[in-house]
């Protein structure tokens, strides 16, 4: 193919069902294209990604992934081709839109990889069904519908239960199971609202059938390889993104396996796939029937998992195939021994486990066909039990495995059985407790139809746990079944140190994709008790600890810092390893560092690795966010060499009591605060300070269980929950200052000098910094306040002997008040690095390797030359039953950013980059039931009334839901937390993809920016 320049479309902000796996696949594609000498142009407003760093793409555009912006990029750049398969559903839909609008034809841009007709055939439920039937590939009894009435008719014909699936959408958005006509009518409007083309498929629900998935690659010459077979432990009806998944497939007969493989290959041929795709197949547990359910003609969450599970670099190979290579011409870069037509063989088992945040959002529903999980982890072991228990620890919910943790201990039999029946998140822990209390595997199978093979694995774990509790010590058996030292110690009534001294050490094994069939030199490692000898690899100088499972508050920003820091160390000539277990990420890719340990981030595992690597290795804990903070004290205690800031400084900053005393000693102001060790004491102290008060437990991230209490009842209600987070630590009560401006400083220090960037938030204090709209350089803050913020950050860096990254948060009112300091990489460091043009991780690497910053001045303040705005991405539409709101708890799942020569331009481009935001053209619903926000929302309504028809709930009465459903309201602006009054309004807005603005200050700023745009303000399309 004669391609000189290619346009790659990213996936934008991280949201439920579209996460960091597209940073991984996009980064790999950019590398593969660059190897061929092709110039790459990337459009992706996700500032936190690695792919938007200078070293991967030739040009990067931080702009919304919408047709008018993409058309301008094409006009300016004139690419020869466009790659649609590496940015998830967002990129595919954008490509189809550009094609249908005639933009690609107008500029002569070719689609590389799967053709647009193939994409449509895969994503339209109607076209998919027709194509499969024509090709003789079995599909479930089903029919497409273009209206709710048609859907109801089809369901009557098929008979209940039915599952409704949505065309052209992401992660099963809007999909649901209906067991009656009433249930169908209640949710069908949301399904249509979630479809880009207003089409759904009504399908007979294959209850209890097995669901498996094949990752398949195909070249332009019709050569096909079925790379990995993955099996969902949960049966049909639970979205594959919310299922626990094992690879390879474990419960299929050879005949079932071959049939499913043939169906998958038939599907990709029918849609003319070129590159990589996945096919979901349903297998009847009671008979020979199998059906093709759906396909994704692109890299997906499953393909990221399959790549990491098999050591087969799917995204890299898919990019080469898109350029016209044959499978047998592409070398597998992991093994350097095999070509892409070689199907991997696995001599280990992987278990992928999702992580949910249902508590945070107040969601109580069980799992279904619409994906709701926020992150995922992948455990690797030589037994199913080992991999599974590892995966449960990795999702970091406080459980030490399938048995022995707080959830396991507290469940009653009744609760456990209900949890299994409803597929509540983490149901395998409930199954373990039910078995522990005497329920048989057969009974559990009858309730939830999970294959007995998997239930028996849980039973084996429970049996060993019972024997440990009875004092029978067989450490080897427990370790082979994935028990941690802590689990064993607790069951035996011994200390963790005693168990460590008693047990044998794990061995290091390589993932070589060949199951040892012939030698392959890979750097992709895991630790296991299912072996006797280590696979030998040369030692490293640094072990950089990654961010682990993604969750609210920990996302791709921390992967950016892990990878960027590791790369900077490698560029300085050091040998570097990364420890991480998140299959979505770039940090768990094979070609980033000298060694990848795909394993747990825990004291036990880090000590195992340090023993293997030798005492010369320096462990770096501050790049991955909060997960590393917990390891400082226990690792330093046993003499592990830790790079950068010392453990005592971390503890001083993390412990709110110690930190406050430090601020008092240094004469730095902070909002008045007090400690409470009990609820009664808290009530008394809060009344003394005067409501409202802010409540913060010690050691949290993402604002978990932080709250503003406006009265005594709210305070008591909150504290009963907060104890769940950190029972040993008291709660801090501080005076809440809602009138100030919240701001922060990102910095790097060597304990003497500091390089820093100030950031301002649009939303007031009380909105979590991760949910705030950030502005660089500060716009409302006066110069004295910015200077004082930098002074304070410098003073703290010197006092705490910071050797590395630092983030300090402030409220500026009549003076500058410090809220908190974090001695680690912050969520905003990718933003400040890209906005200022100075890579903060390069500065961190200087301090780590040489002990000092390579700058002359004591204090350097960096500010960008343009306006930059970072906006949060919320996933309210995904979280069934959640009440959309803002507060001190973080709710956003991702972020986007853009720049502009004026503030309004930067704000609008950034805000438009988050879905489902669009500039309103006709109508707006603007209201609040919270007196604190009335004045500002009145102002916003006044600013827009010349151009838009402004509604209030009182005017519309019972018509609101209908108007939202039929897209008669362009935007909803509201504020405050009043679910008893407006739950239905906000929920319907989220379900119908209506833009929601949930803060009054932001509403005013957006109203001004809309007016600027209405009066011919220009949204420039320019590369970074």
Curated annotation (Swiss-Prot):
Binding positions for Mn(2+) 1 per the UniProt entry: 280, 294
Binding site for ATP 1: 125, 165, 171-172, 204, 206, 211, 237-239, 280, 294
Region Allosteric domain: start-end pairs: 918-1024
Binding-site residues for Mg(2+) 3, renumbered to this chain: 809, 820
Cofactor: Mg(2+); Mn(2+)
InterPro entries noted in UniProt: ATP-grasp (IPR011761), ATP_grasp_subdomain_1 (IPR013815), CarbamoylP_synth_lsu (IPR006275), CarbamoylP_synth_lsu_oligo (IPR005480), CarbamoylP_synth_lsu_oligo_sf (IPR036897), CbamoylP_synth_lsu-like_ATP-bd (IPR005479), CbamoylP_synth_lsu_CPSase_dom (IPR005483), MGS-like_dom (IPR011607)
Record remark on domains: The large subunit is composed of 2 ATP-grasp domains that are involved in binding the 2 ATP molecules needed for carbamoyl phosphate synthesis. The N-terminal ATP-grasp domain (referred to as the carboxyphosphate synthetic component) catalyzes the ATP-dependent phosphorylation of hydrogencarbonate to carboxyphosphate and the subsequent nucleophilic attack by ammonia to form a carbamate intermediate.
Protein name, entry field: Carbamoyl phosphate synthase large chain
Organism name: Pyrobaculum aerophilum (strain ATCC 51768 / DSM 7523 / JCM 9630 / CIP 104966 / NBRC 100827 / IM2)
């Amino acid at each position: 193919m004669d391609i000189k320049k290619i346009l790659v479309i990213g996936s934008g902000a991280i949201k439920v069902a579209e996460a960091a796996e597209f940073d991984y696949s996009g980064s790999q594609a950019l590398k593969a294209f660059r190897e061929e000498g092709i110039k790459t142009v990337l459009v992706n407003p996700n500032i936190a990604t690695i792919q938007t760093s200078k070293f991967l793409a030739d040009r990067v555009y931080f702009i919304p992934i919408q047709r008018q912006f993409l058309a301008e990029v094409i006009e300016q750049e004139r690419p020869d081709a466009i790659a649609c398969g590496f940015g998830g559903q967002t990129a595919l839909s954008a490509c189809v839109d550009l094609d249908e609008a005639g933009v690609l034809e107008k500029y002569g841009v070719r689609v590389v990889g799967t053709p647009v007709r193939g994409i449509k055939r895969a994503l339209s439920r109607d076209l998919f069904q027709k194509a499969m039937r024509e090709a003789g590939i079995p599909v479930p009894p089903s029919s497409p519908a273009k209206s709710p009435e048609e859907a109801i008719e089809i369901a009557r014909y098929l008979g209940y239960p039915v599952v409704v699936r949505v065309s052209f959408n992401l992660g099963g958005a809007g999909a649901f199971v209906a067991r009656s006509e009433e249930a169908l009518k209640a949710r069908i409007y949301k399904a249509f609202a979630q479809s880009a083309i207003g089409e759904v498929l009504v399908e007979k629900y294959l209850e209890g059938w097995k669901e498996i998935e094949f990752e398949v690659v195909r070249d332009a010459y019709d050569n096909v390889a079925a790379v990995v077979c993955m099996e969902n432990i949960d049966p049909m009806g639970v979205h594959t993104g919310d299922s626990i998944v094992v690879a390879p497939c474990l419960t299929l007969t050879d005949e079932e396996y071959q049939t499913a493989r043939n169906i998958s290959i038939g599907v990709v041929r029918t849609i003319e796939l070129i590159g990589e795709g996945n096919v979901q197949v349903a297998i009847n547990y009671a008979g020979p029937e199998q059906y093709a359910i759906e396909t994704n003609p692109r890299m997906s969450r499953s393909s990221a998992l399959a790549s990491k599970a098999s050591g087969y670099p799917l995204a890299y190979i898919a990019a080469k195939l898109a350029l016209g290579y044959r499978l047998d011409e592409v070398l597998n870069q992991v093994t350097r021994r095999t070509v892409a037509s070689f199907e991997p063989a696995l001599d280990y088992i992987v278990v992928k486990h999702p992580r949910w945040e249902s508590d945070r959002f107040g969601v109580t529903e069980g799992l279904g066909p619409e994906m709701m999980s926020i992150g995922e982890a992948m455990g690797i072991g030589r037994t199913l039990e080992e991999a599974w228990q590892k995966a449960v620890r990795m999702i970091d919910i406080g459980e030490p495995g399938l048995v022995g943790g707080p959830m396991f201990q507290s469940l009653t039999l009744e609760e456990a059985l209900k949890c299994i029946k409803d597929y509540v998140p983490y149901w395998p822990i409930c199954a373990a407790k039910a078995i522990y209390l005497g329920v048989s595997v057969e009974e559990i199978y009858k309730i939830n139809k999970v294959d007995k093979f998997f239930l028996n694995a849980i039973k084996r774990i429970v049996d060993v746990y019972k024997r440990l509790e009875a004092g029978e010590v067989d450490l080897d058996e427990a370790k082979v079944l994935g028990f941690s030292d802590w689990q064993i110690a607790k069951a035996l009534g011994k200390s963790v140190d005693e168990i460590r001294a008693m047990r044998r050490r794990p061995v290091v094994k390589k993932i070589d994709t060949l199951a040892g069939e012939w030698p392959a030199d890979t750097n992709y490692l895991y630790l296991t008790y299912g072996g006797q000898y280590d696979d030998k690899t040369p030692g490293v100088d640094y072990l950089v600890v990654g961010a682990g499972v993604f969750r609210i508050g920990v996302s791709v920003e921390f992967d950016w810092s892990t990878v960027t820091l590791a790369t900077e160390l490698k560029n300085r000539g050091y040998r570097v390893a990364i420890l991480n277990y998140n299959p979505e990420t770039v940090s768990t890719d094979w070609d980033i560092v000298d060694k990848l340990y795909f394993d747990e981030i825990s004291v036990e595992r880090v000590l195992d690795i340090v023993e293997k690597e030798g005492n010369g290795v320096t462990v770096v804990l501050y790049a991955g966010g909060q997960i590393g903070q917990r390891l400082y004290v226990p690792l330093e205690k046993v003499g592990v060499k830790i790079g950068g800031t010392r453990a005592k400084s971390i503890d001083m900053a993390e412990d709110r009591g110690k930190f406050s005393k430090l601020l008092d000693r240094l004469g730095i102001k902070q909002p008045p605060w007090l400690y409470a060790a009990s609820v009664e004491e808290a009530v008394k102290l809060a009344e003394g300070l005067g409501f409202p008060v802010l409540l913060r437990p010690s050691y949290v991230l993402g604002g978990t269980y932080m709250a503003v209490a406006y009265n005594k009842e709210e305070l008591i209600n909150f504290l009963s929950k907060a104890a769940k987070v950190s029972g040993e630590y008291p709660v801090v009560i501080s005076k809440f200052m809602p009138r100030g401006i919240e701001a922060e400083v990102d910095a790097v220090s060597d304990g003497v000098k500091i390089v820093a960037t100030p950031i301002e938030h649009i939303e007031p204090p009380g909105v979590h910094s991760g949910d705030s709209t950030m502005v660089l350089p500060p716009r409302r803050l006066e110069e004295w306040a910015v200077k004082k913020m930098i002074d304070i950050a410098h003073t703290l860096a010197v006092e705490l002997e910071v050797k590395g990254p630092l983030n300090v948060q402030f409220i500026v009112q009549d003076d500058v008040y410090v809220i908190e300091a974090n001695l680690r990489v912050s969520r905003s460091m990718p933003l400040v690095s890209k906005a200022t043009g100075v890579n903060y991780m390069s500065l961190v690497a200087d301090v780590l390797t040489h002990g000092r910053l390579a700058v002359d001045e004591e204090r350097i303040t960096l500010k960008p030359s343009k306006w930059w705005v970072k906006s949060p991405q919320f996933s309210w539409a995904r979280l069934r039953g959640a009440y959309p709101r803002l507060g001190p708890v973080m709710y956003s799942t991702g972020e986007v950013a853009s720049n502009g020569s004026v503030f309004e331009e930067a704000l609008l481009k950034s805000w438009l980059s988050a879905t489902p935001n669009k500039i309103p053209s006709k109508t707006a619903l603007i209201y609040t039931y919270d007196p604190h926000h009335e004045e500002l929302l009145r102002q916003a309504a006044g600013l827009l009334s010349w151009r838009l028809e402004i509604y209030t709930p009182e005017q519309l009465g019972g018509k609101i839901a209908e108007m939202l459903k039929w897209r008669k309201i362009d935007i909803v602006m509201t504020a405050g937390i009043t679910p008893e009054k407006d739950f239905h309004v906000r929920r319907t807005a989220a379900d119908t993809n209506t833009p929601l603005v949930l803060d009054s200050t932001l509403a005013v700023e957006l109203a001004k920016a809309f007016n600027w745009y209405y009066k011919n303000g220009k949204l420039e399309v320019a590369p970074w």
